[in-house]
Amino acid sequence: MTESFDNSPLVRTDFSNDSAWRAVVVAATAESAEGFRADLRVIDDRRFDGASPAALIVTSDGWQDAAVLFVADTEALVSPEHPILCVDLGDEPGRSFRCIASELWGVENNLRIANMDFDEFASSVDADEIFRGFR
């Protein structure tokens, strides 16, 4: 039986730079100016090295009840804003957008408690397909 968790998974899929990974985790779990933080289950497991979002969805390693899967892939590690891939696990599994790490708390908090829908964030991305908060 697969264990289920209440917090949202942040899965590392790029193992090329440990310090960049640590920077992503620090930025993604930092408290916002409003006092909120993403409630993440940080998953640093080499069996997910190079895994695609589709493969991660199929794996469902304890996150089958989560609303969203956060993926720290190469782009998230190399970009200064750390745009984490947000993958829908609800209405349209596999649909995705990116969110800068400093705004992840808003996505995670609101999707976890079903205060907002995935589409509300996905439709609010900038021209480069990255969510940087509501403006």
Each language-model region and where it sits:
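Short helix/strand-capping turn motifs
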Residues: 2-119, 134-135
